[in-house]
C-alpha cells in the first residue's frame, strides 16, 4: 500500500514573532513541501486567535499558488457556517481558474473560533434562511460543479474553471462521512482533533461501505533533527478541549 503525505498548516505565531513572520514561514514551508514531493498543502481557518495568523485561507491559497508550481493547495478548511455557499464557490472557482488541477476546497463544520468571533462573522445572517450545514454543503456542491449548472440558469458561480476544485469534507463522525459520500466528496477524518482509534475505525468502515474514494486522516506530527529534540518539542505541546 502506498501513502501520500500532505501538510495542514495553521500559520502559528511563535513567541516574539509577528504575524508577518508566521505567514512568511508558511510560504517557505509550502515551497519546501513541494520540493520534497508532498502531495497537498492546506491552510486552516481560525478567527480572533492571535497565536494563529490565517483567518482567510482563500487569500493564502492564492499567494501560495503563485509561489509554487506543482503541489495541490487548499483549505483545511473553510468554516462554511459563516458564509454564503455561493460566495465560497465564487472564490474557489476563481482559484481553480488561476491554477487548474491544483486547488482543493476543504470544508469544516466547526466555527474556527469562540462565540465572540462567531457572532461577529454571522452578524445579520438569518439561521432559518441559512439552513442546516448539510443544506449549505449541498448548495456549495451545486455551485462548484459545472455539470450541475445548466445553460439556462440565471445565476452561476463564475468563472467556471476547466478543472473544478476538489471537494473535501472535514469531520470526525459517521454522519460527516455519510454526508461526504452522499455528495461524492472526499472525506478527511480529523484525528488531530479527535484521535479515538475506535471511532476512527468505525468512521473508516462506514466510509468504505458508502464510497470508493480513499479516506484521508489528519494527525498531529512533530518533526526534528533527532528523537531527543522531538521529545522535547512534544513536551511543550498542550491540547485544549472547548465545550
Task: Report residues per predicted region.
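Acidic (Asp/Glu)-rich catalytic clusters
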Residues: 2, 34-35, 61-70, 96-103, ...
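An alpha-helical appendage that flanks or caps ligand/catalytic pockets
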Residues: 119, 125-156, 198-243
Amino acid at each position: 500500500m502506498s501513502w501520500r503525505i500532505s501538510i495542514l498548516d495553521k500559520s502559528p505565531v511563535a513567541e516574539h514573532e509577528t504575524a508577518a513572520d508566521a505567514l512568511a514561514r508558511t510560504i517557505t514551508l509550502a515551497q519546501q513541501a513541494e520540493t520534497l514531493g508532498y502531495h497537498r498543502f492546506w491552510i486552516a481557518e481560525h478567527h480572533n486567535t492571535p497565536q494563529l495568523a490565517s483567518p482567510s485561507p482563500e487569500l493564502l491559497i492564492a499567494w501560495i499558488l503563485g509561489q509554487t508550481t506543482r503541489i495541490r493547495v487548499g483549505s483545511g478548511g473553510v468554516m462554511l457556517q459563516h458564509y454564503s455557499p455561493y460566495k465560497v464557490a465564487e472564490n474557489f472557482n476563481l482559484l481553480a481558474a488561476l491554477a487548474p488541477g491544483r486547488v482543493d476546497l476543504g470544508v469544516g463544520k466547526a466555527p474556527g473560533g469562540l462565540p465572540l468571533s462567531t457572532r461577529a462573522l454571522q452578524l445579520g445572517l438569518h439561521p432559518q434562511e441559512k439552513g442546516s450545514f448539510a443544506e449549505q454543503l449541498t448548495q456549495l456542491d451545486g455551485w462548484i460543479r459545472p455539470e450541475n449548472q445548466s445553460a439556462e440558469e440565471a445565476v452561476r458561480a463564475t468563472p467556471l474553471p476547466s478543472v473544478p476544485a476538489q471537494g473535501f469534507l472535514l469531520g470526525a463522525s459517521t454522519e460527516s462521512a455519510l454526508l461526504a459520500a452522499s455528495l461524492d466528496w472526499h472525506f478527511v477524518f480529523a484525528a488531530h482533533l479527535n484521535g479515538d482509534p475506535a471511532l476512527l475505525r468505525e468512521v473508516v468502515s462506514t466510509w468504505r461501505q458508502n464510497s470508493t474514494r480513499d479516506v484521508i486522516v489528519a494527525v498531529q506530527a512533530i518533526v526534528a533533527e533527532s528523537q531527543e529534540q522531538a521529545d522535547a518539542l512534544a513536551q511543550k505541546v498542550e491540547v485544549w478541549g472547548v465545550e
